[in-house]
Amino acid sequence: MHAHGALLELTIGRVVKAHGIGGEVVVEIRTDDPASRFCPGNILRAKDFPRGGPERRYTVVYAREHGARLLVRLAGVSDRDAADALRGSLFVIDSLDLPPIDEPDTYYDHQLEGLQVRTMMGRDVGVVAEVLHTAAGELLAVRCDSGEVLVPFVGAIVKLVSLDDGIVEIDPPKGLLDL
């Protein structure tokens, strides 16, 4: 489990490929706030994920929507070769740099991942492996002994989230936990 308040690196985008000849990169968005993360003047930390190179920093010149992705121009990346060299790189931020959430019962994904899941009757179900975002809402992918179970993250099922205790307590409908 992640220690409450522990520093984690969170990926906010991944460079998919170069775009055009002017140095733009196509970025797969992995943040719920791309407008503020990729706003002009922001400094992005880039991890050279596929090649294991050193972390580099880039200043955003501009970003614009490109379907479900962004086209991003970075200072110092002025041609296709320089942009293509970034392919596969991950833009990351530190979890402690995230603004606090003021809404009750709202969490960042990384806060839920690693929490123990149990029923209201005390039966251990497993550990939250991932939070999935679907058109129908959020699902907790819970890793358990018999595989994985998807638990809708809704008040009718998720009765308690305690970050301090590291638990998610659920009241599953009949059949939800049957694999």
UniProtKB/Swiss-Prot annotation:
Organism expressing this protein natively: Mycobacterium leprae (strain TN)
Cell compartments where the protein resides: Cytoplasm
Any one GO molecular function term: ribosome binding
Task of the protein: An accessory protein needed during the final step in the assembly of 30S ribosomal subunit, possibly for assembly of the head region. Essential for efficient processing of 16S rRNA. May be needed both before and after RbfA during the maturation of 16S rRNA. It has affinity for free ribosomal 30S subunits but not for 70S ribosomes.
Main location: cytoplasm
Pfam family, one: PRC
Gene Ontology cellular component terms for the protein in this record: cytoplasm; ribosome
rRNA processing recorded as keyword: yes
Annotated domain remarks: The PRC barrel domain binds ribosomal protein uS19.
The PRC barrel domain, residue ranges: 104-176
InterPro entries with a match to the protein in the record: PRC-brl_dom (IPR027275), PRC_barrel-like_sf (IPR011033), RimM (IPR011961), RimM_N (IPR002676), RimM_N_sf (IPR036976), Transl_B-barrel_sf (IPR009000)
Family statement drawn from the similarity comment of this UniProt entry: Belongs to the RimM family.
NCBIfam families: 16S_RimM
GO terms (BP aspect): ribosomal small subunit biogenesis; rRNA processing
UniProt keyword annotations, A-Z: Chaperone, Cytoplasm, Ribosome biogenesis, rRNA processing
Gene3D superfamilies (alphabetical): PRC-barrel domain, RimM
Cross-referenced PANTHER family: RIBOSOME MATURATION FACTOR RIMM (PTHR33692:SF1)
Subunit text: Binds ribosomal protein uS19.
Protein name, as recorded: Ribosome maturation factor RimM
Region forming the signal peptide: none
SUPFAM superfamilies according to UniProt: PRC-barrel domain, Translation proteins
